[in-house]
């Protein structure tokens, strides 16, 4: 078993939200998107929520573990793996990135890792006949996917 870094849930979620979509996490948990918001901010809201409990924390850790493991198997490629257990479904690189963007906050990759802007990324997704990702971009995207997966596997959220 790996050694995990314990991080309080109210610190971990904003950090993780930079990399992955919390909407995907709440969908995996079968909760509404506002569930996390109400749990995090219950002291400042008129809500019946009492914040996170042990069951919530356990569920979040399980989801982060599943997402992390699946991201480690996910790779963007001109020759897709066709493995059902990845996030990169689709024949073309833009299709694979679109399916991956349901889980990952793509600005984390194209701004933070590639140093590009939204227009650069959007052009390559919307008009792949004209604009392409080069091999270096694909390699850096795949490294970022691995990094996110490893980070998710290395943390344990706590109360």
Can you name each region flagged by the protein language model?
Residues 1-22, 77-104:
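A short, Lys/Arg-rich alpha-helix, primarily the initiator
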Residues 20-29, 105-114:
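Short alpha-helical "recognition helix" segments of helix-turn-helix
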Residues 24, 118-122, 145:
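Tyrosine-centered aromatic motifs in long, intrinsically disordered, low-complexity repeat arrays
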Residues 29, 40, 61, 113-114, ...:
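A general structural motif at alpha-helix termini
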Residues 30, 115, 148-159:
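Short amphipathic alpha-helical segments
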Residues 32-52, 117-133:
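Recognition helix of helix-turn-helix/homeodomain-like DNA-binding domains
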Residues 52-72, 135-154:
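DNA major-groove recognition helix of helix-turn-helix/homeodomain DNA-binding modules
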Residues 68-86, 154-159:
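Short amphipathic recognition helices of helix-turn-helix/homeodomain-type DNA-binding modules
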């Amino acid at each position: 078993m790996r050694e995990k870094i314990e991080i309080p849930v109210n610190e971990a979620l904003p950090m993780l939200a930079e990399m992955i979509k919390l909407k995907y996490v709440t969908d995996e948990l079968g909760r509404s998107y506002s569930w996390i918001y109400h749990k995090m901010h219950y002291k400042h809201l008129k809500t019946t929520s009492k914040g996170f409990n042990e069951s919530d924390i356990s569920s979040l850790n399980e989801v982060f573990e599943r997402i992390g493991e699946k991201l480690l198997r996910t790779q963007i490629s001109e020759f897709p793996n066709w493995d059902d257990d990845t996030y990169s479904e689709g024949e073309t690189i833009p299709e694979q990135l679109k399916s991956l963007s349901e889980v990952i906050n793509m600005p984390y990759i194209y701004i933070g890792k590639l140093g590009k802007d939204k227009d650069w990324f959007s052009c390559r997704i919307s008009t792949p006949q004209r604009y392409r990702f080069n091999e270096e971009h694909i390699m850096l995207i795949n490294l970022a996917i691995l990094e996110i997966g490893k980070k998710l596997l290395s943390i344990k959220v706590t109360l």
